[in-house]
């Protein structure tokens, strides 16, 4: 269709946005699994594994909550894209922004549990953080592209905030 290039490109970027959120979940899960194992085994000169310390346990709990919330959100966005839901573009953009920015936060929080050793090349956390830092820029930057797209959606006179909830009339 002549003149439909922009719409076609936008549709391709919609699906890609949701997948960036999934990439973020994968990075967070890998970092969490490593850090959980580390916390269960590392004693840091004490008699008990560091997972017994409240600060470490809470950091792991917060990371797990963020991972599961992001996973569910991204699954919802990918499903909306797959079934061509009216709110798919909004959900995909939100999943990309939320997932990529949450991954950076969760990775740095988990690196604090491990400490300076997290930068050791034998430990995966440094590499995972490098990958996570690319996600807010990848597939349309969160600030320059994705938030602008979301802003445009929100400004539409016909915008229905319940569209992504499945509550809006279709």
Set out the residue ranges of the language-model regions.
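Generic, well-ordered alpha-helical scaffold segments in large soluble proteins
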Residues: 31-34, 38, 76, 109, ...
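C-terminal helix-coil-helix/basic helical segment that borders enzyme active sites and/or dimer interfaces
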Residues: 40, 44, 64-98, 111-119
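Alpha-helix initiation and N-capping motif
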Residues: 3-6, 32, 53, 71, ...
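Glycine-rich beta->alpha junctions and the first turn(s) of the following alpha-helix
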Residues: 1-68
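Glycine-rich phosphate/cofactor-binding loops in nucleotide/flavin-utilizing enzymes
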Residues: 114-170
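Alpha-helical transition-metal enzyme core signature, strongest for iron centers
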Residues: 25-32, 60-70, 74, 96-107, ...
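Alpha-helical scaffold segments that form or flank carboxylate-/histidine-based iron centers
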Residues: 17, 51-62, 88-98, 131-134
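A ubiquitous short alpha-helical element
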Residues: 23, 59-63, 91-95, 117, ...
